[in-house]
Amino acid sequence: MCLYTRVLILHYHLLPLYGPLYHPRPLPLHSILVYMVHIIICGHYIILFLRNVNVFPIFLQMALWRPSDNTVYLPPPSVARVVNTDDYVTPTSIFYHAGSSRLLTVGNPYFRVPAGGGNKQDIPKVSAYQYRVFRVQLPDPNKFGLPDTSIYNPETQRLVWACAGVEIGRGQPLGVGLSGHPFYNKLDDTESSHAATSNVSEDVRDNVSVDYKQTQLCILGCAPAIGEHWAKGTACKSRPLSQGDCPPLELKNTVLEDGDMVDTGYGAMDFSTLQDTKCEVPLDICQSICKYPDYLQMSADPYGDSMFFCLRREQLFARHFWNRAGTMGDTVPQSLYIKGTGMPASPGSCVYSPSPSGSIVTSDSQLFNKPYWLHKAQGHNNGVCWHNQLFVTVVDTTPSTNLTICASTQSPVPGQYDATKFKQYSRHVEEYDLQFIFQLCTITLTADVMSYIHSMNSSILEDWNFGVPPPPTTSLVDTYRFVQSVAITCQKDAAPAENKDPYDKLKFWNVDLKEKFSLDLDQYPLGRKFLVQAGLRRKPTIGPRKRSAPSATTSSKPAKRVRVRARK
């Protein structure tokens, strides 16, 4: 029914004709005539609209709802909020100085010398291109003798250390240490070569030495720093590798330990599994793993324990350009070159490798032997030393001089030089000094704080003598009295005690500072710098001198001179 007819029906009270409870009754004649006339008018309107191809009266359309065909995205799940340590750690006004003694190490710069042949003990490998990872042990502040015991309540609070300043002292003069290989895989000088060697079957290795990339690095945190390197991956079973095929690569993350090799300019990779010739790189890394700090992962650490802050400086350039001898595993496509008519007719080795160099060594851009103050860490941990420990990862290749030592095989020393009568040795020495400023902080043990710390690291509460009881058991357990007796069945071996130290199997340089804390900041170089930086005044050690009391024989005040007028 058209809209016009509906209006007329409502106007002339004809709506009851369509009601279900309507009882028929006679209608007036004029009402029936009016109703028929308007129905005819609506029919003419419909015929008029049907003559148009693309036009249809809107009152004959029906609205139909259809669901959208687009993808419906659900809201992302909520992310657990990580709280900054400043929100629940309250600093105090008490600062301590702690410093290590002079830390020295000596060894062979290229490899470890095993015991034997006159050596009663192994000579370690000590190179300037190794990570030095110091694990600094701090005293427990909750068991520490404090000058003021009213700064915290042991029933509702706990004490922690926060690192406020650090200075890493570095000894020994600047120098350039060389590394090399007596059988280095060096084929051609591809920078200035006139004729390349195409077919090589004999041994063309040579004795080559290089100076590595310069690196200065310092990472401070309460957890070990994380490194990355490329290692040999696992091939799929559907695509097995044949002998001589290039193995797949896999990026691995490991903890940076003391003695690990840094990136020297040849890449961060496992050379022991990815280079079977043992002559592609110098001696000190040909069977080692060179690691590079994974700054991306440490920066993304939700709690920020592995890196409070970091300092780094790297410098490198290529000195020589060589290629490698051997069969090319990846053949050069013929579309990339035109065959020659003379020698060489086919392309030679296309595996190119530079010799790295760190260039000039200078003291103008040194990162060490200067203080650093920690005001705001890059992560959520603002210098709080959980578990009363601190990890300092250091690399400094600027004082990398290798000492050459020669000893005569005859006594006395022969008067005429003969190289066969002298033994040559190489040693590398390193010298460090660690100085810290620690601030004493308190943590109020509310339910929310303890719940958050337990979710972050439950072992922290265990160190504070808080434990979670195991769930009660309802089963009956048999307990024998004489466990070692042969009269009873063999009992199960007791479970080994859990190792509370998660870094027990890792290698670090342990530095114990539990007995080297001092409140006398002005007695140490770093402490005096901190007092100046913080605007604090040092405590007077010598009191002011007292004025001497006046003696009993003190003369009286001189009388004033009286002027006498002369008489006229």
Swiss-Prot record:
It is found in: Virion; Host nucleus. Residues 537-548, 558-568 have a biased composition (Basic residues). Pfam families: Late_protein_L1 (PF00500). GO terms for cellular component: host cell nucleus; T=7 icosahedral viral capsid. Transmembrane segments: none annotated. Keywords: Capsid protein, Disulfide bond, Host nucleus, Host-virus interaction, Late protein, T=7 icosahedral capsid protein, Viral attachment to host cell, Viral penetration into host cytoplasm, Virion, Virus endocytosis by host, Virus entry into host cell. One of its GO terms (molecular function) is structural molecule activity. Belongs to the papillomaviridae L1 protein family. Self-assembles into homopentamers. The capsid has an icosahedral symmetry and consists of 72 capsomers, with each capsomer being a pentamer of L1. Interacts with the minor capsid protein L2; this interaction is necessary for viral genome encapsidation. Interacts with protein E2; this interaction enhances E2-dependent replication and transcription activation. Forms an icosahedral capsid with a T=7 symmetry and a 50 nm diameter. The capsid is composed of 72 pentamers linked to each other by disulfide bonds and associated with L2 proteins. Binds to heparan sulfate proteoglycans on cell surface of basal layer keratinocytes to provide initial virion attachment. This binding mediates a conformational change in the virus capsid that facilitates efficient infection. The virion enters the host cell via endocytosis. During virus trafficking, L1 protein dissociates from the viral DNA and the genomic DNA is released to the host nucleus. This is Major capsid protein L1.
